[in-house]
C-alpha cells in the first residue's frame, strides 16, 4: 500500500492522471488488441512499485513516477510529428524538465519539503534509468508488464525473471546466466517482431502524417498533443478532411503492410532497443552476449537490419 503523502498526492495529480489516456504504444493500440492497460500512467506507477520493491528511496520513487509525465498523446509519436529523431525517440526526455516546471508538480513537492531539482532528472537515479543495454526499472517494467512479452518469455514468467534480478552497487544485475539469456532473447524477439515490427512502425508514420496534416489545416494545435489520445483522435475525425479520414481509417486490427524498397508508399524508422544484462558469475560481472556468443551475433545482425524501413 502506498501511504507516503508525496507519492499519494503525485499519483492523484492532474499531470499523472492525464497519462491514463496516453497509450504506451501510441497507434499500435489500434492494430493490436488486448493492450488497453498499457498506459503511461500504469507504466509510471509500475516503475515506482519496482523501485520500491528493490529498496529505492523516496526521491527515486518520486522520480520514477514523474519520468514519463511529459509524454504527448500517443507517446513517442511526437518524435514523428515534431521532427524529432525517430532513432532516439527522446522528444519527451528533451522537454521533461520544462514540462515539470510548468506543471503543478513543483508545488506538490514543496508542500512536502522537497525541491523539484532533487527528483526531476531520471538519469540521476541509477536504478530508475540506465543506458541501453543495461537493466533499469524503466526497461524492466515496460518489457515484463507487456502482454505480448508473455509468449516470447514462455515458459518463463515475469515473476521468474524478477526473482533473478538483484541490486549490486545500486545497479540491476542478474544472478542466473540461463534466465538472463532467455530474458534477453525474449526481449529482442518481442521488440523486433512486435513493438518495432513493420506494422507498428508504419502505423506511427501514418498517424503522424494525419496529425501533421491536421496541424497544417488548423484542425489541431500543438497544445492538443499534450492531452489524451482519444481527445486528439476525436479532433482528427471532426476535421472532416478526406486525407486525414483515409489515413486514420487504416489503423485497425486488419491493417497490414509490406516492406518494399523499390516502390515505397512511406518511409520510416524506429529506435533499436535491446538488453544485454550483466550476470554475476564466479569470474565477476559478464554480459549475456559474452556468455552466449550466438546471442551476441544475433544482436549484431538485428542492429544491422534496424535502419530505414520502406513500405
Per-range role (PLM):
Residues 1-59, 73, 77-311:
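Histidine-centered, transition-metal-coordinating active-site segments
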Residues 60-68:
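Short alpha-helical catalytic segment bearing the HExxH-like zincin motif
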Amino acid at each position: 500500500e502506498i501511504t507516503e503523502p508525496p507519492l499519494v498526492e503525485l499519483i492523484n495529480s492532474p499531470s499523472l492522471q492525464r497519462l491514463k489516456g496516453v497509450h504506451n504504444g501510441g497507434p499500435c493500440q489500434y492494430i493490436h488488441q488486448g493492450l488497453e492497460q498499457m498506459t503511461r500512467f500504469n507504466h509510471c506507477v509500475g516503475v515506482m512499485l519496482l523501485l520500491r520493491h528493490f529498496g529505492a528511496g523516496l526521491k527515486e520513487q518520486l522520480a520514477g513516477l514523474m519520468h514519463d509525465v511529459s509524454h504527448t498523446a500517443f507517446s513517442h509519436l511526437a518524435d514523428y510529428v515534431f521532427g524529432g529523431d525517430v532513432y532516439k525517440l527522446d522528444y519527451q526526455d528533451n522537454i521533461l524538465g520544462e514540462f515539470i516546471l510548468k506543471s503543478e508538480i513543483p508545488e506538490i513537492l514543496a508542500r512536502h519539503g522537497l525541491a523539484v531539482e532533487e527528483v526531476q532528472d531520471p538519469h540521476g537515479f541509477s536504478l530508475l534509468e540506465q543506458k541501453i543495454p543495461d537493466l533499469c526499472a524503466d526497461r524492466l517494467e515496460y518489457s515484463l508488464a507487456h502482454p505480448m512479452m508473455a509468449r516470447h518469455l514462455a515458459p518463463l514468467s515475469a515473476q521468474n525473471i524478477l526473482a533473478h534480478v538483484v541490486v549490486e552497487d545500486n545497479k540491476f544485475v542478474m544472478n542466473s546466466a540461463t534466465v538472463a539469456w532467455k530474458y534477453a532473447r525474449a526481449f529482442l524477439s518481442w521488440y523486433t517482431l512486435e513493438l518495432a515490427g513493420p506494422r507498428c512502425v508504419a502505423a506511427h508514420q501514418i498517424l503522424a502524417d494525419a496529425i501533421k496534416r491536421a496541424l497544417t489545416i488548423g484542425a489541431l494545435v500543438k497544445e492538443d498533443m499534450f492531452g489524451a489520445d482519444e481527445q486528439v483522435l476525436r479532433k482528427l475525425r471532426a476535421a472532416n478532411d478526406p486525407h486525414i479520414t483515409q489515413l486514420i481509417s487504416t489503423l485497425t486490427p486488419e491493417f497490414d503492410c509490406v516492406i518494399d524498397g523499390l516502390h515505397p508508399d512511406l518511409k520510416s524508422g524506429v529506435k533499436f532497443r535491446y538488453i544485454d544484462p550483466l550476470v554475476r558469475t564466479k569470474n565477476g560481472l559478464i554480459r549475456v552476449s559474452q556468455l552466449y556468443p550466438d546471442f551476441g551475433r544475433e544482436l549484431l545482425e538485428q542492429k544491422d537490419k534496424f535502419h530505414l524501413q520502406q513500405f
